């Protein structure tokens, strides 16, 4: 809910105090997930897979573009970011979060209902962002939607990610 609240704020209210809802929501999701992990029978190989998904997810959400522009900036000058993973699809975080939660099931016995619920809620959030919030709060987003697929990368997007 915090992440959705942050999106509504970006598109409609523009209140400075609500700009950090997304990163705070992400931290709370991580904490809720950590509380559900079973550390008694850890699978090392799946831990490595989970770690890889987590690192890429963190990069996609907080490292591939300016965190200040994405999560702090209040003016209407935010522009679409269409490089790297965002050349593959408009919401690469959805794919990596789903991969993370699936791998956490095998690594730490995270219950499947938790993994499915968090992944489904993330997909719903991305759908709302894509349809209602990002076109209102990120300049150039409508054009970006015409060029880059929602979730499933195309061969053109895969080629684009390797361009310098």
Predicted feature residues:
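Active-site His/Glu-centered metal-binding helix of metallohydrolases
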Residues: 93
